[in-house]
């Protein structure tokens, strides 16, 4: 499995470099940059290293950051009891069924009805659920949510999305610097640095926003796969029941679910007005996909 991931990583990197080279060649950018003192090869390498490197550093730190930012309390199976012990046992059983190493299991205290999985690899992953989810969902629905999150781990979605984010980062850095450099050559010498700096910041923000649409699209496709994987583990009806409960929860009036129990970027999403930027498909679409599947 690791050989496949390394191969995918290397192939992706090669494709990024080749694509950038083709684009710059077609547009005739290379000779122009060389004539104005900007080495294209060095820029490609710089953007690639920083773009991909930054994404993978984030992946390596993902468990630590999730625990710190969400206040996740890791369950110790040796001392756990009651609901915590039951949650741990469910994850343990589902992980075994999915042929996965046992992930860390945690709970974070929040009224939101949500869960997430993170971590740099299948052997170093974390599955966490909110206290609000445990209060609202019954056993079958909780298992559906856990199966969905473990399917993310089994599918290697954290690594896949990191690769995609790294590619987007590399392109954002490359083209923002190319365009800002070109703009700076159109003004007087004393203004070039200021123009290059400001335009690079503005373009980086703009391209990052556009790039997030690409990342969100791929994220939505992974959600459908995780739903399908979860259905294989616990059955289609349990997965549908979990998503139906989420839909009812988020359709409820705000005072019935708590002001903080709003849609987040984990298992549920309700960003209708920004559908292109949503990392999760609408719950209705996910439920329909499961109903039309053979799981």
From Swiss-Prot:
Q: Which cofactors is this protein said to need?
A: Zn(2+)
Question: Where does the chain bind Zn(2+)?
Answer: 148, 152, 223
Q: Which gene encodes it?
A: htpX
Task: Give the molecular function GO annotations.
Answer: metalloendopeptidase activity; zinc ion binding
Which stretches are transmembrane? Answer: 6-26, 40-60, 163-183, 198-218
Q: What is this protein called?
A: Protease HtpX homolog
The free-text cofactor remark is: Binds 1 zinc ion per subunit.
What GO terms fall under cellular component here?
Answer: plasma membrane
UniProt source species = Leptospira borgpetersenii serovar Hardjo-bovis (strain JB197)
Question: Per its UniProt record, what HAMAP family does this chain match?
Answer: Pept_M48_protease_HtpX
> Which keywords, in A-to-Z order, does the entry hold?
Cell inner membrane, Cell membrane, Hydrolase, Membrane, Metal-binding, Metalloprotease, Protease, Transmembrane, Transmembrane helix, Zinc
Task: Spell out the Gene3D superfamilies in the cross-references.
Answer: Metalloproteases ('zincins'), catalytic domain (3.30.2010.10)
**Where are the annotated coiled coils located?**
none
Task: Give the GO terms filed under biological process for this record.
Answer: proteolysis
């Amino acid at each position: 499995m690791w050989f496949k991931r390394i191969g995918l990583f290397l192939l992706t990197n090669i494709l990024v470099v080749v694509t950038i080279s083709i684009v710059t060649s077609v547009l005739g950018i290379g000779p122009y940059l060389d004539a104005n003192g900007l080495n294209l090869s060095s820029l490609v390498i710089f953007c690639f290293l920083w773009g991909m490197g930054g994404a993978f550093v984030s992946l390596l730190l993902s468990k630590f950051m999730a625990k710190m930012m969400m206040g996740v309390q890791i369950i110790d199976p040796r001392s756990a009891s009651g609901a915590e012990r039951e949650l741990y046992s469910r994850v343990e059983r589902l992980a075994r069924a999915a042929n996965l190493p046992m992930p860390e299991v945690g709970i974070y205290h929040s009224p939101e009805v949500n869960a997430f999985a993170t971590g740099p690899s299948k052997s170093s992953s974390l599955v966490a659920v909110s206290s609000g989810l445990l209060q609202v969902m019954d056993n079958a629905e909780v298992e559906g949510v856990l199966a969905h999150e473990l399917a993310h781990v089994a599918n290697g979605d954290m690594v896949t999305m990191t690769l995609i984010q790294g590619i987007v980062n590399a392109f954002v850095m490359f083209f923002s610097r190319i365009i800002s450099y070109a703009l700076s050559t159109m003004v007087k010498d004393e203004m070039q640095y200021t123009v290059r700096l400001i335009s690079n910041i503005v373009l980086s923000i703009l391209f990052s926003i556009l790039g997030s649409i690409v990342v969100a699209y791929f994220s939505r496709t992974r959600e459908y796969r995780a739903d399908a994987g979860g259905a294989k583990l616990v059955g289609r009806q349990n997965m549908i029941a979990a998503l139906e409960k989420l839909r009812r929860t988020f359709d409820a009036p705000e005072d019935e679910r708590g002001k903080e129990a709003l849609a987040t970027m984990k298992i549920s999403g309700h960003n209708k007005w920004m559908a292109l930027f949503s990392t999760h498909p609408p719950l209705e679409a996910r439920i329909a996909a499961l109903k039309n599947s053979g799981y």
